[in-house]
């Protein structure tokens, strides 16, 4: 049974109660549902729809949209506001007048549901951000993996120690050893703890004779499939909504770009991850490593056995490993087949093809 109303909420513990409020052309819709689930959908700008959901009692905020353009349009809300209902574990976001009306309704719900919410009404609704929808989304970190990053074997332990103590780290070895996962997870940890200002992820687009020109869309959309392994880890560690906020060009806390875009840049106060480094040439590797500035950690991952460079072209990863072998300021970690942690089948496959 679903009960709908306008301007007030029906106290029905068995039904889903919905309150709808209109503020000019900007609509804020609150969906009230019996605990443990509560969600809020807001229509903020030009009909753009975003969903903020939570699972009580943990404050797991989720940001979704019917299309990416919906979320982007919502994020650009001018004169917007964001409220956090701590006890309901939900965010309400949109035009300021509409959010104020939603706030009143949330207070009413908290009063009626005193059995579950015993704190004072004033403590239940905290205004996070006014006149700035972008920052509000940045504050809305949804559920994310906060478990400690632990090593599953000795090689991973050396890798973690190298990332924590060195400015330049090379990691090479077979597939499934956790090179990409650990580097992305540590980068997310550094960003959350504000040890760095941004994360930069890059990789060469050369892979198995494929070309970005065959993929649809602009350069960002063409590059997206290549970024997916790192993206999945960052979303898991940062949270989906905070990740969307970080990817905004004007925010720039997380940047993804093809390797060719690194020329002429300087990396400072950042964690830089170069993935699939076996597919860069020696000259390209030199260009990349000379981009290093202050307070930067550069992690270079690759697998020499999966090199897609033309025959006779030396891999920049192999060349760099030889040049920095004796350098105490550089961390070098080599993973073997026995260090594969992806699955038993993956480990057997590595041995079968060795």
Swiss-Prot record:
Residues bound to ATP: 173-180
Organism: Escherichia coli (strain K12)
Organism taxonomic ancestry: Bacteria, Pseudomonadati, Pseudomonadota, Gammaproteobacteria, Enterobacterales
The keyword Nucleotide-binding is assigned to this record: yes
Record InterPro entries: P-loop_NTPase, PhoH, PhoH2-like
The name this protein goes by in its record: Protein PhoH
GO molecular function, one term: ATP binding
GO cellular component: cytosol
Compartment annotation: Cytoplasm
Disulfide bonds, paired cysteine numbers: none
Pfam family, one: PhoH
Record-stated family: Belongs to the PhoH family.
Alphabetically ordered keywords of this record: ATP-binding, Cytoplasm, Nucleotide-binding, Stress response
Induction entry: By phosphate starvation.
SUPFAM superfamilies recorded: P-loop containing nucleoside triphosphate hydrolases (SSF52540)
């Amino acid at each position: 049974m679903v009960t709908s109303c306008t301007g007030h909420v029906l106290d029905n513990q068995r039904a889903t109660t919905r309150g709808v409020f209109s503020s000019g052309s900007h609509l804020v819709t609150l969906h009230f549902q019996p605990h443990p689930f509560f969600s809020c959908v807001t229509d903020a700008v030009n009909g753009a729809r975003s969903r903020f959901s939570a699972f009580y009692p943990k404050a797991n905020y989720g940001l979704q949209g019917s299309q990416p353009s919906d979320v982007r349009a919502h994020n650009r809300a001018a004169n917007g506001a964001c409220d956090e209902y701590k006890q309901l574990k939900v965010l309400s976001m949109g035009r300021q007048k509409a959010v104020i009306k939603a706030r009143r309704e949330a207070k009413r719900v908290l009063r009626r549901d005193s059995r579950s919410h015993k704190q004072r009404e004033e403590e239940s609704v905290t205004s996070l951000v006014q006149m700035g929808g972008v920052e509000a989304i940045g504050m809305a970190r949804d559920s994310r993996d906060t478990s400690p990053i632990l090593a599953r074997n000795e090689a991973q332990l050396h890798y973690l120690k190298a990332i924590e103590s060195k400015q330049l780290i090379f990691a090479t070895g077979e597939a499934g050893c956790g090179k990409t996962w650990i580097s992305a997870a540590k980068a997310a940890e550094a960003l959350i703890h504000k040890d760095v200002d941004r994360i930069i992820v890059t990789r060469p687009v050369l892979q198995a004779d494929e070309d970005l020109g065959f993929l649809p869309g602009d350069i960002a959309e063409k590059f997206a499939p290549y970024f997916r392994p790192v993206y999945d880890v960052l979303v898991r560690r940062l949270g989906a909504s905070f990740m969307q906020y970080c990817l905004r060009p004007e925010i720039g806390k997380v940047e993804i770009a093809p390797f060719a875009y690194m020329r002429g840049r300087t990396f400072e106060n950042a964690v830089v991850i170069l993935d699939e480094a076996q597919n860069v040439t020696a000259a390209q590797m030199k260009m990349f490593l000379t981009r290093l500035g202050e307070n930067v950690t550069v992690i270079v991952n690759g697998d020499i056995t999966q090199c897609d460079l033309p025959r006779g072209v030396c891999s920049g990863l192999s060349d760099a490993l030889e040049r920095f072998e004796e350098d105490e300021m550089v961390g070098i970690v080599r993973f073997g087949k026995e260090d594969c942690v992806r699955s038993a089948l993956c480990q057997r496959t590595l041995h079968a093809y060795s």
